[in-house]
Amino acid sequence: VGESGCGKTTTGRCVAGIEKLTDGNIYFDLPKTSMDVLEKAQAGKIARQENQEIEQINSSYDINKITGEAFNYYRKNCQMVFQDSFASLSPRQLVSDIISRPLRLHKICANDELLPKTIDLLEQVGLGREHLYRFPHQFSGGQRQRISIARALALDPKLIVLDEPTSALDVSVQARILNLLHNLQQQRSLAYLFITHNLSVARHMADNIIVMYFGKVVEAGKTEEVFSNPQHPYTKKLLAAAT
C-alpha cells in the first residue's frame, strides 16, 4: 500500500518481469535453504566458500538472470492483472482468443482442448460460453476485469500480481471482484501480490502488508499487527486519514 507515485506499480511490474531492475534481486520460488543463505549474506555472516553458492542461487532463481527452462517456468507461474482492463485487453481480439492465447503459446493443451478449457476458465470467473465471441468493448468494467483474471489463471500460476484491480470499478462491483479473487485463492492455493492504495481492501485481502513511501519500504509486517500497532509516522498518517 501507499499513495500514488510511491512505486507500488513499478515494484509489481518488476516482479512480473515487465520492467527490469537497475539494482538488486528478485527471487522466484526460492527454497527455504537458499533463503537462509541469502539472509546470512545480507547480515554479513557468510563464509567465503558460500559465495559460490550465492552465485548459483542467483543463476537459478533471480528472475533477471535465469534463462531457458527456469525462465519459462517463472513466466508460466507469475502472471499479472492490470488496473485498466480496457487497455490491457486487445480490442481486436475476441474473448476466446484472449484467454486461449497463453494456452497456445505455452502449449498447455491440444487444439481440440482449447475451447473446453477456455469455457472452463470463463465459468471460474463468473462468465460463460455466451461471452466467448465478443470483443472487450462489449463488456462492463467488472466483466472485463473478470476476463483479465481468467487470462491470468489460464497457465495455473503460483503467483498473480494484481495492480489495483478494483480501483476503477463501482463499489458494488469491487466487492464482487474481491470475493471472486478470495475464492479463487482458496480453490487454487494462489499467492497474490496485491497493489492498492485502499487500506480497507488491503486489510480484507492481505496476510502481510508492505507500506511504501517515495519509492521505499517504510514498514512491513502481518496485516493486523500493522493496522493495530503502526510503527512508522507515514503508516500512522495513512491509517488516520482512512478513519
How would you describe each model-predicted region?
Residues 55, 113-130, 239:
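Conserved ABC ATPase "signature" region
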Residues 202-204:
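A short, surface-exposed alpha-helical micro-motif characterized by mixed small hydrophobic
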Residues 16:
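Helix-to-loop junction immediately C-terminal to a conserved catalytic motif
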Residues 154-158:
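A short, proline-enriched helix->beta-strand linker immediately N-terminal to the Walker B motif
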